[in-house]
Amino acid sequence: MQEITTLEQFNEIIAGDQKVIVKFFAGWCPDCTRMDMFIDPIIEEYSQYVWYSANRDNFPELAEKYQVMGIPSLLVFQNGEKLAHLHSANAKSPGQ
């Protein structure tokens, strides 16, 4: 999973025709570390998406714009629009 490091890169990635998933995380977040322990099989299962990560603390304006109120959060984008949003607090199992 490639980490997004600039706002320009983020905007370019989400603008494409292909659906992408961006995982918002923070280095201090214990739930983010737990998610990393089981995310690889999920990425493999959903390989039709291109996966990226973005440190929420580096992009507070994106967190506000896309309502990333908790982390980790998975957001699906296509053609510059947010299609779906899963916050870890709403997931009952790793499969979700």
Sequence positions of predicted segments:
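A short glycine-leucine-enriched loop at secondary-structure breakpoints
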Residues: 65-69
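Short, thiol/selenol-centered motifs that function as redox-active sites or metal-ligating centers
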Residues: 28-35
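Residue-level signal for alpha-helix termini/capping positions
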Residues: 14-15, 44
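CheY-like receiver
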Residues: 12-13, 62
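Short active-site neighborhood of thiol/selenol oxidoreductases, capturing the structured segment around
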Residues: 15-27
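Non-catalytic, surface beta->alpha helical segment in thiol-disulfide oxidoreductase systems
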Residues: 70, 75-96
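Thiol-based oxidoreductase modules, predominantly thioredoxin-like and allied folds used
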Residues: 3-6, 24, 36, 40-61
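Proline-centered helix-kink/hinge sites
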Residues: 19, 37, 41, 72-75
